[in-house]
Amino acid sequence: PVVGVKATLVDGSYHPVDSSEMAFKTAAMMAFKKGFMDANPVLLEPIASLKVTVPDKFTGDVMGDLNRRRGRVLGMNSDHHGKQVIEADIPMSELFGYNTDLRSMTGGIGLYEYEFSRYEQAPGDIQKKEVEARAAKVDKLDV
């Protein structure tokens, strides 16, 4: 979806022969496409607040995995039962398969919970990859 966009129609005219609902919709669509691209849009990705609870001996492996998944570790606290609670922000797209990977890293002991936090601008390489993937889908539909 496109968010944070405001459009104001400042001028227009009506002609009894050439004007129709379809003509106005087409004109609006063309104006939006031009204005949208002139505004240099960016792709936003959802970010989750993540808490991972793991035994002390697995902390390094889990933190390395979070970094590999583009996560930002915000802090780490001991729960005083030999476990660490790691808090991080991470793109939600990087959480696919995390349950399986965390269980593998921790021998089935690690737990995690997350919730949506906000949207952030995706890195340039991710934006490029997503735009190319969507363009390929559109090209397939045009065939």
Residue ranges and their predicted role:
Residues P1-V143:
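Accessory interaction regions appended to the cores of large information-processing enzymes
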